[in-house]
């Protein structure tokens, strides 16, 4: 997994360094809301942190294992949060656009509508459509 220096900009796009943005969540702190969790999960994809991605995935939909781009061919280019919606006291949805490139290919834009649930005080990724 790539490492981030404490003063490196956070991959999630917020104007903070990694150590004060997504770093604490990757180290085990609970995200305060669904958007923050989604941003931390994006940063985990950038860092190829499968352990965090699995830990932040709700047990009811979590896969047994997760295969990321181990060859390092995917370059994540940026994240834009388009909409965050609290759908209930313990549920939320986040729509975002992620940009990436595989190898020397053209940049790709991916839009995802993710659902999140709060369980025992922690937010988890549930699924996407």
UniProtKB/Swiss-Prot annotation:
Q: Which InterPro entries match?
A: NTF2-like_dom_sf, SEC_C_motif, UPF0225, YchJ-like_M
Show the stretches that span the lipid bilayer.
none
User: Which region is the signal sequence?
Assistant: none
Q: Which PANTHER family match?
A: ADENYLATE CYCLASE-ASSOCIATED CAP C-TERMINAL DOMAIN-CONTAINING PROTEIN (PTHR33747:SF1), UPF0225 PROTEIN SCO1677 (PTHR33747)
So what family is this one in?
Belongs to the UPF0225 family.
* Protein name per Swiss-Prot or TrEMBL: UPF0225 protein XOO0286
